[in-house]
Design a protein with these regions (language model features):
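Polyanion-binding interface signature
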Residues: 2-109
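Charged, low-complexity intrinsically disordered regions
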Residues: 89-146
Length: 146
């Protein structure tokens, strides 16, 4: 996967942070050439990302929530709690999110969706990415903390 221009995901980060100002907890975020990672408080193993990944040889953008503990059982427990509230988050996020095994790492879990690779010159798409990631955070973070 070729990194997108470094400043692109920094643009996403700047816009994203404005969208989630009312979400409880201490926001941490890091932008890099292939994406943006966001977590609250000390919860680095349970986080949100907008990141470029490769699927069947194509570069795509994955947006959503990840549980990335070393043990499958821990990740399954996190996903299970969120699936117990699926009616709530589906009502807000729609049919696009897929819940299950992480793309490329079988032991991790996700609630996320895949978009076409973004054009790094398209500021409007950067705003859309930030808004969609903020949707995930705004809906899932209160459920994750419950």
């Amino acid at each position: 996967v070729q990194p997108v221009e470094r400043t692109y995901f920094h643009q996403v980060q700047d816009v994203f942070e404005g969208f989630v100002i009312d979400v409880a907890g201490t926001l941490h975020s890091t932008a890099h050439g292939r994406g943006l990672k966001v977590w609250y408080d000390d919860s680095t193993r349970e986080h949100y990302e907008a990141q470029l990944i490769r699927v069947d040889g194509a570069v795509v953008l994955e947006i959503g929530f990840h549980a990335e503990y070393p043990k499958v059982a821990e990740n399954d427990a996190v996903l299970g709690r969120l699936l117990g509230e699926e009616q709530v988050w589906r009502g807000e996020l729609g049919d696009e999110p897929e819940a299950g095994v992480f793309i490329g790492v079988d032991r991790w879990r996700r609630i996320s969706e895949v978009w076409d690779e973004p054009d790094p010159d398209d500021v409007d798409v950067a705003i859309e990415i930030a808004a969609r990631l903020a949707d995930y955070v705004s809906v899932l973070e209160p459920l994750r903390r419950a």
